[in-house]
Amino acid sequence: MTLLRLNPTLFCHWRMLLLRPCVVLILWLMVAVWPLSAQAARPLNTDDANVVDPKGCQLETWVRRTRSSTEQWAVPGCNFWGDVEWSLGGQQRSEDTPWTSGLVLGQAKKRWLRLGDGDWGVATTLGFINTQPTSDFNATQRDVYFNAPITRALGQDRFVHLNLGWVQHNRDGSSRPSWGLGGEWPISPRLTAISEVYAETTTPSQYQVGLRLWVKPQRVQIDTTYGNVMGSATDQQWISIGLRLLTPAFLP
């Protein structure tokens, strides 16, 4: 991950990174498909009630580009035992200024009710986010959060996800409820459309729409999204591309 301020050469590099997955997406729409079981994951910010398969791991990585910054994310996670998914990852943010910042995220997600076809799933998540600015003008910030994802299966690989949570902000000592509502609708057995809206109370809601595609069923997935703040013009919009890798069970 680069720590440097974006220059025209780097911007062209990111533009190509954003265009290539779109080309891949179109190509894969032309190939044969077969039935798959869907589950919520990247690129949704609204979490689902599922966890990684027992003794398995995943890596979610993505790039998020706004008008003034580029974020690079990588979040690995594993299910060692007890239907608990442990994740520890980070983000690096490059502004169109001399400043950059880093972020460390860790969480544990427990599945309490396994999702079945035409059924409900319930989980809880407890985690933290540490922001590490490189600027001397900003101190390290730590947020702690709790979230309760609830998933409703509607059949035919259609899902609705509801999140209810709480966030404690270290910077100003404030605590706020958080919420999210998202959905998944299959376009084909490999391709799924997603949409969501989410926020912390007293802050503007954000929305996101996108596509998720299985390149290799249950092992390799790519995605792309567009998002914005409700009621905002184009100055706060973003686009993202992502890659998700899943392993078979291999942990002892």
Indicate residue ranges for each PLM-predicted region:
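N-terminal secretory signal peptides that target proteins for export/translocation
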Residues: 1-19
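Sec-dependent N-terminal signal peptides
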Residues: 20-28
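Hydrophobic alpha-helical transmembrane segments of integral membrane proteins
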Residues: 18, 31-32
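Transmembrane beta-barrel domains of Gram-negative outer membranes and organellar outer membranes
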Residues: 39-252
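Residue-level detector of bioactive/disordered segments in secreted/extracellular proteins
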Residues: 13-14, 24, 80
